[in-house]
From Swiss-Prot:
Record HAMAP family: PyrC_classI_B
Native source organism of the sequence: Pediococcus pentosaceus (strain ATCC 25745 / CCUG 21536 / LMG 10740 / 183-1w)
PROSITE patterns in the record: DIHYDROOROTASE_1 (PS00482), DIHYDROOROTASE_2 (PS00483)
Manner of cofactor binding, per the entry note: Binds 2 Zn(2+) ions per subunit.
Gene symbol of the encoding locus: pyrC
Keywords of this entry: Hydrolase, Metal-binding, Pyrimidine biosynthesis, Zinc
Function: Catalyzes the reversible cyclization of carbamoyl aspartate to dihydroorotate.
A molecular function (GO) term: zinc ion binding
Protein name per the record: Dihydroorotase
Length: 425
């Protein structure tokens, strides 16, 4: 099967080039200014951006256990509609993938039900909430690509110390949800004047920064690859930057909502603005962008967390934490960062494809050269459109960005040479 993509602006080798791309079966076989061959499909890309498929190392597909919120089929549909060709799914499902048997079953289900490359996290501890460590070697052999207890922090230093020692031996990243539960105080948003004004319980910044400081010292001691999920505080960026300068093997991600939303935008008790970590201050938001631009934070990850309408109804006091993100990430980032000149589109592709693939050792992802697996995405960045809940492929419509006008709509997504999404019209 040959697919010829004509008249593309291709993002490769850190620059944009006007060229054609030929795909044969699952591989890129030619990248030339003008390719004239017979092919089963010839698609005129019409000068739109063609880039390596996007990579999201932090998503929640809720499958198994909460498939009323999302499942592998609907999550995959949302991912490819957002331009993603590889995602890593978190282990806060039921049953938790904490044994080789459960991991094997999840990997098989992801492969058969999904329409893109899906990597599976194993949990760090049994059932994710205990202090008993899993068998990391056995889970890796069963298909785990990394380990996390996302949704909960590791509450004791000894457990985290032993986890890092053992995970280092298997050579995979430990992705940490940094949260000291003793400092959460049943909060639902950032602790501060806005929470006080709204009469809502706040979450102290120490819930994140105190556990992060602990973990960075453990990572320094063990030499493990310690990855920080959804960084939300300026102080966290500072701690990570200092540890990196000292040679600690620490990497970090930031979510789009923490880059573009802050507590000052919460003018009422609005469950759509409830997420964990919470939306912080304007100064925190600016520091996160600074950390992204200077390389302290190496990637953007959505923390795609779909919920039912019922879960996100009522008050922030009772609604679930979380926001969908796979279908809105690229357009929001392109519109709010690239369009105003805060970064280049090449940098955005680094953060959303190349670097997450490199940092998590996803060897077939984030590539666009002859001989590479044909995981490709075409984006229309010229025409404005409105984010509408009716257009979501995800089961979750819990997004505060609905109604915003953006640029960067996915036109085509190809996974291993197969077109898995193509926008009608």
């Amino acid at each position: 099967m040959k697919v010829l993509l004509k008249n593309a602006r291709v993002i490769k080798s850190h620059q944009v080039q006007k060229t054609d791309v030929l795909v044969e079966n699952d591989r890129i076989t030619q990248i030339q200014p003008e390719i004239n061959v017979e092919a089963e499909q010839i698609i005129d890309v019409k000068n739109q951006l063609l880039m390596p498929g996007l990579v999201d190392i932090h998503v929640h597909f809720r499958d198994p256990g909460q498939t009323d919120k999302e499942d592998v089929v609907s999550g995959s549909a949302a991912a490819v509609k957002g331009g993603f060709t590889t995602v890593l799914t978190m282990p806060n499902v039921d049953p938790v993938p904490d044994t080789p048997e459960k991991m094997t079953a999840m990997v098989k289900h992801n492969q058969t039900a999904g329409s893109l490359h899906i990597g599976q996290y194993g949990s760090i501890t049994k059932k994710r909430t205990s202090e008993e460590l899993v068998d990391f070697k056995a889970l890796k052999e069963a298909g785990a690509v990394a380990f996390s207890n996302d949704g909960n922090g590791i509450q004791t230093a000894e457990t985290m110390y032993q986890a890092m020692l053992q995970i280092k031996e298997v050579g995979l990243p430990l992705a940490a949800h940094v949260e000291d539960e003793s400092l959460m105080q049943h909060g639902v948003m950032n602790q501060g004047t806005v929470a006080e004004k709204l009469g809502l319980p706040g979450i102290s910044e120490l819930a994140e920064t105190a556990q992060l400081a602990r973990d960075l010292e453990i990572a320094r001691n063990t030499g493990a690859h310690y990855h920080v999920c959804h960084v939300s505080k300026a102080r966290s960026v500072e701690l990570i930057r200092r540890a990196q300068r000292d040679g600690v093997h620490v990497t970090a991600e930031v979510a789009p909502h923490h880059l573009f939303l802050d507590e000052t935008m919460i003018s009422m008790d609005n469950p759509m603005m409830k997420m964990n970590p919470p939306l912080r201050t304007l100064e925190d938001r600016q520091a996160l962008l600074g950390g992204l631009l200077d390389g302290t934070i190496g990637m953007i990850a959505t923390d795609h967390a779909p919920h039912t309408v019922k879960d996100k109804a009522g008050s922030m006091k009772t609604a679930s934490f979380g926001i969908t993100g796979l279908e809105t990430a690229f357009p929001l980032l392109y519109t709010k960062l690239v369009k105003p000149g805060l970064c280049t589109v090449e940098q955005l592709v680094e953060w959303m494809s190349i670097q997450p693939a490199e940092i998590f050792n996803l060897k077939a992802a984030g590539q666009l050269e002859v001989g590479d697996v044909a995981d490709l995405t075409v984006m229309n960045v010229e025409d404005e459109y409105e984010i509408k809940e009716a257009d979501f492929a995800s089961k979750g419509i819990n997004s505060p960005f609905i109604g915003q006008k953006v640029y960067g709509q996915t036109q085509l997504t190809m996974v291993a040479g197969k077109i898995v999404y193509q926008r009608e019209g």
